[in-house]
């Protein structure tokens, strides 16, 4: 900026000199009566010589201009963190490698000349080598090259910018690959004063024709509109930073690169109308009761039910008096399993600009009533048939008299009386353009408005109302779709209950908003029913919990061929047990990919993915490590910190897990104090304190040790109850014995281990003896063993730790 005035003045001076010179020349031509055509010849010659001279001196400027002209016809580039690029001085640019044109994105974002590092096998091709040499390309091989490393160091020392992609290869799965240590070797001979490392992250090219995503995913991502590309540059790092430190920063920068896309997202209701209009004749849902439902029918009914919901609210004259930390819109209760009815009601509630609250029908009457009171729910959409099924299972729900139950069966009868209106609506949906439908039915574009309230599992205490806005949910859907490489021919099994974030976001909203067919099945514990639904409909993506997947693996009626169509199986909501992973893979020949998250993160934060083998370079693109919960999703950052002072810990050091991302919740309903405890803003990112203990390895894979609340302090040592359960599982038959470890206070040792065991009377004593006589560490051996009828579980299949501890206390008296 200081030199800008001098540059402009100098430019104006030379322009004036040139104009004066040509004016004098034109005067001479007139005086001596020379044909004016020769003047134009002379001007053309001067222009040609000048252009050739500039091309020789500044070839990169011409290329940058040409790139911009060509690139901006198809793409729109947004640069975040440009202020972190030094105006002068040496720097090493390090970032992710997602496509063949990443170098072009970097060069267009930075006006300075950049020396790019290129794989020697590409550089050596004779027909491009001569051009690459002109632009100072630095060739390097995968085995390393002393000359190339010295050249990189030389350019940095001379004050130039050098760009290197430390993965050394294009990503095959959209995630970061292993960072090679070549740049560390290049910087060894440099001092910290010679330059800095500038990390960067590119978003928007995964799924393009220039990436190595699969054909089906690329086909889904083709668009006639300009593709939005974002590149985010981070703050300067020391030149001698290690590869795992740089990779961690690149991961965090993905948050900034995703920022513009997430901020520009529609509401869920508007996104639904767009998707439905694009796929009117396609099947949206196949329901076990309702049959095949097309997008045309689904959109028509969702718009019609929206009127019904608004009318009911008006009739009931509902005007909730909200607290200071609660949304102003009315909350509508939904008490339905995974089904067409549930999906339709959720969409209609959002179109009506209300808040959807999917109630946990397995939580017990006390917890259910507390949730209804906290959210100030006056009306609940449910089904008589479903309530009868719950009653047959011993779940009797008694609602207060001020709660209005609206049964889906009655809605169906009401709709039958209005067939003409519904038919008219269907015609309108078919004819009217998407933008007009949105302006009529969903005029609000505020993606920060609260969309849903989900009550947390309550596995360790009272359920908390988690407020998620439209941006939270749409961001997480986009992230998940990217890493799963969703295809047009994918079919997703929707069997997880919608009161769980995993079921609502991943198996309910994702297929509907991504234009993917879903198969609804209301009971995930019905192994044979699930398997039949998968086999009959060629399901390709199945999500479940360790508990549910274990049920399928142990069921003798299920055959491997029933799950043959599955291309990916994802486990979440609870830790995937080793025996479940092994048994499932042996029986069905399908790997389970474990993920991680929380209701507070909408829910997915990280997930394992299939590994890819690169035959060009004989490399494994590793996206799956057994025992881990995968790498953070694109746009998500994970930090491991000291729980006492929030200082960052190094790779492989256990600490408190923080999750940052656009999917981090707004807060807890009517509980700002608790929200402020678990959500902290650091470096411009909102971080959620998970309460989990774990670590990141050098490649960025996340490993969970246990929850901090699931540690017992015995004789001064912190012992993980989860680790105890893993050790015990090695010595007993987990197919016939279920167990859970908890801890109780002890006057001498601080705490003592209690083991609750679910098994037959005949084998209880044998199980206890097997554990007592095993070679597990003495500190891991329980003090008390209690036989119980059934391990308490939540609706998601997770162990109800709160009830387990209460049960242990009562038994120990």
Model feature map: region roles:
Residues 589, 621-626, 646-647, 664-691, ...:
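Conserved ANL (AMP-binding/adenylate-forming) active-site segment centered on the GW(Y/F)…HTG consensus within
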Residues 474-491, 499-540, 555:
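Conserved AMP-binding/adenylation subdomain of ANL enzymes
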Residues 408-409, 751, 775-799:
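AMP-binding/adenylate-forming catalytic domain of the ANL superfamily
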Residues 405-455, 462, 485-491:
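Conserved pre-ATP/AMP-binding loop-to-beta segment of ANL
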């Amino acid at each position: 900026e200081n030199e800008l005035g001098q540059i402009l003045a100098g430019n104006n001076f030379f322009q004036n000199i040139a104009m004066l010179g040509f004016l004098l020349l034109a005067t001479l031509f007139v005086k001596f009566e020379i044909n004016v055509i020769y003047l134009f010849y002379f001007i053309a010659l001067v222009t040609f010589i000048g252009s050739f001279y500039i091309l020789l001196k500044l070839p990169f400027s011409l290329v940058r201009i040409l790139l911009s002209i060509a690139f901006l016809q198809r793409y729109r580039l947004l640069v975040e963190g440009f202020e972190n690029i030094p105006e002068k001085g040496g720097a090493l640019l390090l970032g992710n490698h997602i496509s063949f044109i990443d170098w072009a994105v970097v060069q267009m974002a930075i006006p300075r000349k950049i020396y790019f590092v290129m794989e020697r096998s590409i550089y050596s091709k004779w027909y491009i080598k001569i051009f690459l040499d002109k632009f100072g390309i630095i060739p390097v091989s995968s085995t390393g090259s002393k000359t190339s490393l010295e050249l990189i160091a030389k350019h940095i020392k001379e004050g130039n910018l050098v760009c290197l992609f430390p993965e050394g290869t294009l990503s095959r799965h959209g995630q970061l690959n292993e960072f090679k240590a070549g740049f560390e070797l290049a910087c060894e001979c440099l001092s910290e004063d010679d330059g800095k490392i500038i990390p960067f992250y590119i978003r928007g090219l995964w799924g393009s024709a220039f990436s190595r995503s699969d054909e089906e995913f690329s086909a889904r991502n083709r668009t006639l509109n300009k593709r939005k590309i974002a590149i985010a540059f981070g703050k300067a790092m020391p030149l001698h930073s290690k590869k795992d430190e740089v990779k961690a920063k690149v991961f965090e920068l993905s948050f900034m690169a995703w920022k513009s896309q997430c901020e520009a997202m529609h509401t869920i209701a508007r996104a639904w109308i767009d998707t439905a209009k694009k796929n009117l004749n396609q099947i949206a849902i196949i329901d076990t009761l309702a049959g095949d439902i097309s997008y045309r029918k689904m959109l028509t009914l969702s718009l019609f039910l929206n009127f019904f919901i608004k009318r009911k609210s008006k009739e009931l004259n509902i005007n909730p008096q909200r607290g200071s930390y609660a949304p102003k819109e009315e909350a509508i209760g939904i008490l339905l399993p995974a089904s067409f009815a549930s999906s339709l009601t959720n969409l209609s509630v959002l179109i009506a600009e209300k808040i959807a609250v999917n109630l946990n029908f397995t939580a017990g009457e006390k917890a259910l009533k507390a949730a209804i009171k906290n959210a100030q729910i006056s009306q609940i959409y449910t089904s008589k048939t479903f309530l009868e099924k719950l009653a047959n299972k011993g779940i009797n729900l008694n609602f207060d008299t001020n709660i209005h139950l609206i049964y889906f069966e009655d809605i169906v009868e009401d709709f039958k009386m209005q067939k003409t209106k519904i038919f008219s609506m269907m015609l309108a949906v078919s004819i009217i353009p998407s933008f007009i439908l949105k302006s009529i039915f969903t005029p609000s574009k505020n993606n920060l408005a609260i969309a849903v309230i989900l009550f947390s599992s309550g596995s360790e205490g009272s359920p908390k109302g988690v407020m998620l806005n439209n941006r939270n949910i749409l961001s997480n859907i986009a992230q998940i779709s990217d890493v799963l490489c969703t295809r047009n021919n994918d079919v997703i099994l929707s069997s997880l209950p919608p009161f769980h974030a995993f079921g609502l976001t991943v198996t309910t909203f994702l297929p509907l908003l991504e234009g993917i067919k879903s198969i609804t099945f209301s009971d995930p514990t019905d192994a044979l029913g699930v398997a039949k639904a998968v086999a009959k409909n060629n399901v390709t993506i199945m999500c479940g919990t360790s508990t549910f997947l274990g049920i399928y693996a142990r069921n003798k009626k299920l055959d491997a061929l029933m799950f043959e169509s599955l291309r990916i199986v994802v486990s979440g909501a609870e830790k995937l047990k080793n025996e479940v992973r092994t048994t499932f893979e042996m029986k069905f020949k399908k790997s389970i990919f474990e993920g991680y998250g929380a209701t507070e993160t909408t829910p997915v934060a990280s997930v394992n993915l299939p590994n890819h083998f690169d035959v060009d370079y004989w490399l494994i693109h590793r996206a799956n490590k057994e025992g881990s919960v995968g790498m953070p999703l694109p746009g998500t950052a994970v930090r491991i910190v000291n729980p006492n002072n929030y200082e960052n810990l190094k790779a492989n050091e256990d600490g408190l897990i923080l999750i940052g991302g656009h999917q981090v919740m707004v807060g807890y309903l009517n509980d700002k104090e608790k929200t402020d405890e678990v959500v902290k803003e650091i470096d411009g990112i909102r971080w959620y304190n998970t309460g989990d203990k774990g670590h990141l390895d050098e490649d960025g894979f996340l490993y969970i040790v246990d929850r901090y609340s699931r540690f017992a302090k015995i004789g001064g040592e912190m012992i993980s109850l989860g680790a105890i359960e893993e050790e015990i599982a090695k010595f007993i038959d987990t197919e016939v014995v279920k167990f859970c470890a908890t801890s109780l206070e002890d006057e001498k040792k601080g705490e003592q281990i209690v083991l609750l065991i679910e098994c037959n009377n005949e084998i209880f004593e044998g199980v206890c003896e097997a554990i007592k006589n095993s070679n597990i560490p003495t500190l891991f051996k329980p003090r008390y063993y209690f036989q119980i009828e059934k391990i308490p579980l939540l609706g998601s299949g997770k162990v109800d730790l709160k009830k387990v501890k209460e049960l242990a206390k009562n038994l120990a008296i």
